[in-house]
């Protein structure tokens, strides 16, 4: 494909097709199921799904079979199946994106809104613009572009789901149903839901951490009691007991997880090599891009150690505490108990079952003065290492990066989680996993002022088109 002609074509398609539809998508307040208790009845997820279906039909992708799946009790899912146009090509390429959204949060600029799209300095602002709305329209536009350029393609399938920000349970359910349709020769999987360290090259994610979320429930009193004459100094304070649990997980001197089962035995050598190359390009930008108050310093001074911390070491954070009175509601009473929600990010290649047993041991080995202390595990997602891409895919993607960004492709790890990738890998262990995206450090996904770099989006459409036509 001639790169100049392709760039010009994609520029036009982005302006007349992608951008207006993506703006309409932002206007739909379709929060992920975890954040919208009424998702089954308010029709917002279905409205977003219908927008995707309408866009796919509008593009008139040749021979595309467009399916909107709506099984009872599950969120909608869009599955598109496009047969190969190459003769005797029985390979399948699977592309993925999600169209549910995080809550809006606070702190948006006065002239910006999560559901009223704004274009400013070649960035599109609004919830879902970067995570992950652009992916759906980019993927479909790339496929149509290939057809318009008369490129012969392998079979292409698309899965667009609407529960990624909550759980992968719905996606796994549908994926298992689709396995017989997908067949046994899926050679590449492209989840377009990852990030980039800059907008000057194609970034390829080769590792993601897992996540383990759990609740620590502490019960001491059958009712609230006056903390002065009744309970103070007699009954152990709830946060003190919660801290005992936390201290069993975290080394309080340095904040590191001390449960050995949570650590990977050895970081792959290829990761060390790629980190060195990445740091040569990015340097300390990772730190500079964090919204720190003056005087706040990172846990370590060495950038490489910080990136290893973020990608290949476990962390534990407190997400919330129930039954802890707000300051404005303060009284002289001790609550009957508390529930602390904790979340661990876990490196790839660790054993979930051993970690859960180790966490249970933290409870059984500690003394809590007879208080009822229990663990409730409510969510787990596997980490994944994707270090075995074929040379053919690497070469195509690297050439595409040079053509459309002007620089070589770079591999890097991610500190976040896309648990479904590990599940896909278990079903198709020999497939190339091409995990990429254009969510940069200024995209603010999950936070206020989420935005999409529109120039990077155009380049990503070009790269997808190029890869699909060359693979």
Annotate each PLM feature:
Residues 2-105, 337, 341:
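N-terminal helical capping/dimerization or prosegment-like subdomains
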Residues 49, 88, 198-199, 258-337, ...:
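An extended, acidic, His-containing surface patch that forms the Zn2+-binding/catalytic region
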Residues 89-160, 455, 459:
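Active-site metal-coordination/substrate-binding segment of hydrolases
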Residues 99-100, 249-254, 360-370:
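A common structural junction motif
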Residues 123-124, 128-207:
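Acidic/histidine-rich catalytic neighborhood of metal-dependent amide-processing enzymes
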Residues 130, 222-224, 231, 344-352:
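A generic structural motif
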Residues 229-255:
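A short core secondary-structure module
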